[in-house]
C-alpha cells in the first residue's frame, strides 16, 4: 500500500513566510497554516526590496520570485528603460511608437519598437538590443571606412 504524503502548508516554508504580505492576505482571509503549498490561490507577497505582487502559492513554491527584481514586469522608476538607460531612452521615437513609452518596458524587453537618432535616422529594433549597445544603423554605416581609405592610411604611415 502506498504511503500517504503529509500535506505541506505555506507556514512550513520559511522563504515564503518571509515574503507573505500579512495585511493584504488577512483581508482575503488567507491563513498560511491552512493553505497548502500546491494551492492555486493568488496571495500577496512583498520582497526584501519592498515590491508587492500577487502570485499563486503553487508558483511561488515552485520557485517564482519577485517579477520586478527578475525583470519579468516593469516597475516605473526601478527597472524601466527610462530609469536604467536614459541615453537610449532619449532616442525613443514617440511619434511612431504611439502610446508605448520607454517607462512601460524593462531594459531587457524583446519588444521591437521605433528609434530616432539625433541625426534624424529612424529604424526599428528590439529594446534589449539597444540596451546591449546596438546603435543607429544609419550612423554606423556613415562611419565605416572603406578598404581604399585603410590602404591610404597604411601607406602614409610607412
Positions of PLM-derived features:
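Functional cation/ligand-contacting sites centered on basic and imidazole/sulfhydryl donors
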Residues: 1-158
Amino acid at each position: 500500500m502506498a504511503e500517504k504524503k503529509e500535506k505541506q502548508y505555506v507556514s512550513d516554508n520559511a522563504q515564503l513566510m518571509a515574503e507573505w504580505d500579512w495585511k493584504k492576505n488577512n483581508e482575503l482571509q488567507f491563513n498560511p497554516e491552512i493553505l497548502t503549498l500546491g494551492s492555486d490561490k493568488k496571495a500577496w507577497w512583498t520582497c526584501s526590496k519592498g515590491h508587492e505582487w500577487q502570485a499563486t502559492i503553487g508558483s511561488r513554491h515552485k520557485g517564482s520570485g519577485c517579477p520586478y527584481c527578475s525583470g519579468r514586469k516593469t516597475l516605473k522608476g526601478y527597472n524601466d528603460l527610462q530609469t536604467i538607460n536614459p541615453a537610449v531612452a532619449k532616442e525613443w521615437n514617440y511619434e511612431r511608437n504611439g502610446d508605448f513609452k520607454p517607462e512601460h518596458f524593462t531594459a531587457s524587453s524583446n519588444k521591437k519598437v521605433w528609434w530616432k537618432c539625433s541625426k534624424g535616422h529612424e529604424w526599428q529594433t528590439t529594446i534589449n538590443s539597444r540596451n546591449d549597445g546596438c546603435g543607429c544603423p544609419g550612423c554606423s554605416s556613415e562611419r565605416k571606412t572603406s578598404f581604399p581609405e585603410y590602404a591610404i592610411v597604411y601607406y602614409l604611415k610607412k
